[in-house]
Curated annotation (Swiss-Prot):
It is found in: Secreted. Contains 2 disulfide bonds. It comes from Californiconus californicus. Belongs to the conotoxin L superfamily. Expressed by the venom duct. Residues 21-48 form a propeptide. The cysteine framework is XIV (C-C-C-C). This is Conotoxin Cl14c. Keywords: Cleavage on pair of basic residues, Disulfide bond, Neurotoxin, Secreted, Signal, Toxin.
Amino acid sequence: MNVTVMFLVLLLLTMPLTDGFNIRATNGGELFGPVQRDAGNVLDHGFQRRRECPPWCPTSHCNAGTC
């Protein structure tokens, strides 16, 4: 197995442990600076944190960023 594949497999295995970058809660959000805050949670693309409706969610079903 080459190095790239091993790295990707390792990344996939460790992602659930970080809960999609929610590590920012441990130190007030400054772990990776502004980039980290903009990235938000990988799974919800930051919409829920910003309380915005994601584009794929009908406005009538949207409640504070959650569908």
